């Protein structure tokens, strides 16, 4: 009979298991610039959060307003569609409006089919953008494709702009795909069609990057992406891509979907890759619900990075899910109001109280885990559950400091949080 080793017995020479993501893969550093702002993608820089507008770019006012909203939510680079002469004509106006509002977020132009024409015909558009996104799969075929691609790279070189070569499995180069399928048919053991498509995506991205370098684009001005809409395919593609080049990589699950499905799918794919040290910038492609807030994709991207311990953007609220021990939804309402309060305060706190973005706040609903979780947080409150004394102890830096009672617990706790932030993170700051 076999017996399991007693887990309470100490192991000789045992070391604790590793915690944290793998070291980031070494990549070139690509600088995306506008005005006095430089966002570095790759190298030793933190993973960058991106987003994309869904306005008609020809409507300069609406687009500038949405870009500002995305930037204020925390998007460090914003991409806009440039698909028509009318849109291209308004790009410089959008940039001017943003500059007047003090929004220096870099803009990326998203080009498909006619980018070579638009960038050439509207040089003010080419200059106002900080980066171009090129999809080599929809630039025509044969010599026409090569000429169109070369024309866009020539514009990028002339204006000293970096480029993202973004391959998408929905618009993969037909000639490359046919060649790859033909090669596969001659294998002794042919791959499944899905594997051939994944390989073609990687080959397309890398070969076009090499071609761009041959045309004069600096190697530190190239970012790559290979977008697919299935989680396992995305993971496999980026593992392969990261092993075969040192260009910085833009991660994103294309057509992720709406609401929780899109959030779960994007998180499932990106978390695996980020944990393996793969990925230099991310964008969460959520299909917005009618009347939904476009900034949601920015918040989700930030939350993925923060919950993985890769970056800190705003204080995190820990809250229990509730159970039969909780007599009301008050703790849930308090957790939501505190999280909203923290986000509202961050534009001011970010500059006034450095480090506050790493603060942890606990809002718990009963005595089972409430005091313990509150002690682990920087500041926490344990609300009474069913049958418990109607009192809410507050813990600060692991110590019980005060007990709140009555009808104004939410307001009093919010004031305590604000005072704690000022005392802990405002030390030495001159106001």
UniProtKB/Swiss-Prot annotation:
Protein name as catalogued: 4-hydroxy-3-methylbut-2-en-1-yl diphosphate synthase (flavodoxin)
UniProt keyword list: 4Fe-4S, Iron, Iron-sulfur, Isoprene biosynthesis, Metal-binding, Oxidoreductase
Known pathway: Isoprenoid biosynthesis; isopentenyl diphosphate biosynthesis via DXP pathway; isopentenyl diphosphate from 1-deoxy-D-xylulose 5-phosphate: step 5/6
Family: Belongs to the IspG family.
NCBIfam families noted in UniProt: ispG_gcpE, PRK00366.1
EC number: 1.17.7.3
Disulfide bonds: none
Region (Disordered) residue spans: 1-24
UniProt GO MF annotations: 4 iron, 4 sulfur cluster binding; 4-hydroxy-3-methylbut-2-en-1-yl diphosphate synthase activity (ferredoxin); 4-hydroxy-3-methylbut-2-enyl-diphosphate synthase activity (flavodoxin); iron ion binding
Reaction(s) catalysed (UniProt annotation): (2E)-4-hydroxy-3-methylbut-2-enyl diphosphate + oxidized [flavodoxin] + H2O + 2 H(+) = 2-C-methyl-D-erythritol 2,4-cyclic diphosphate + reduced [flavodoxin]
Keyword flag Iron: yes
Residue ranges of the TM segments: none
Residues that hold [4Fe-4S] cluster according to the record: 320, 323, 366, 373
Function field: Converts 2C-methyl-D-erythritol 2,4-cyclodiphosphate (ME-2,4cPP) into 1-hydroxy-2-methyl-2-(E)-butenyl 4-diphosphate.
HAMAP family: IspG
Pfam families xref list: GcpE (PF04551)
Cofactor: [4Fe-4S] cluster
């Amino acid at each position: 009979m076999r017996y399991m080793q007693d887990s309470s017995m100490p192991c000789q020479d045992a070391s604790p298991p590793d915690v944290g993501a793998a070291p980031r893969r070494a990549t070139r550093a690509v600088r995306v610039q506008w005005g006095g702002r430089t966002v570095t993608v790759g190298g030793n820089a933190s993973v960058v959060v991106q987003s994309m507008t869904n306005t008609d770019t020809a409507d300069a006012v609406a687009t500038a307003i949405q870009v500002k909203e995305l930037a204020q939510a925390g998007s460090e680079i914003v991409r806009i569609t440039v698909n028509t002469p009318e849109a291209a004509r308004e790009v410089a106006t959008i940039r001017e409006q943003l500059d007047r509002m003090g929004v220096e977020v870099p803009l990326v132009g998203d080009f498909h089919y006619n980018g070579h024409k638009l960038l050439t015909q509207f040089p003010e558009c080419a200059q106002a953008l900080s980066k171009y996104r090129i999809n080599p799969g929809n630039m025509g075929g044969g010599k026409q494709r090569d000429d169109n691609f070369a024309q866009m790279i020539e514009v990028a070189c002339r204006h000293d702009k970096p480029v993202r070569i973004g391959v998408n499995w929905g618009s993969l180069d037909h000639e490359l795909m046919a060649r790859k399928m033909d090669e596969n048919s001659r294998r002794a053991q042919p791959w499944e069609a899905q594997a051939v498509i994944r390989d073609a995506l990687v080959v397309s991205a890398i070969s076009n990057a090499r071609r761009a370098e041959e045309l004069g684009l600096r190697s530190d001005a190239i970012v790559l992406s290979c977008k697919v809409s299935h989680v396992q395919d995305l993971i496999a593609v980026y593992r392969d891509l990261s092993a075969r080049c040192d260009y910085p990589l833009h991660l994103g699950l294309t057509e992720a979907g709406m609401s929780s499905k899109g959030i779960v799918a994007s998180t499932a794919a990106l978390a695996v890759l980020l944990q393996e040290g793969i990925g230099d910038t991310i964008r969460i492609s959520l299909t917005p619900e009618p009347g939904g807030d476009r900034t949601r994709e920015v918040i989700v991207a930030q939350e993925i990075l923060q919950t993985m311990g890769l970056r800190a953007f705003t204080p995190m609220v820990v809250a229990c899910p509730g159970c039969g021990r909780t007599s009301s939804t008050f703790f849930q309402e308090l957790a939501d109001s505190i999280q909203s309060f923290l986000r509202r305060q961050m534009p001011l706190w970010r500059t006034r109280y450095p480090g506050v973005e790493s603060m942890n706040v606990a809002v718990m609903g009963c005595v089972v885990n409430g005091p313990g979780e509150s002690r682990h947080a920087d500041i926490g409150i344990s609300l009474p559950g069913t049958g418990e004394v109607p009192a809410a102890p507050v813990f600060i830096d692991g110590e019980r400091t005060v007990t709140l009672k009555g009808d104004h617990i939410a307001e009093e706790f919010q004031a305590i949080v604000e005072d704690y932030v000022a005392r802990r993170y405002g030390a030495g700051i001159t106001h």
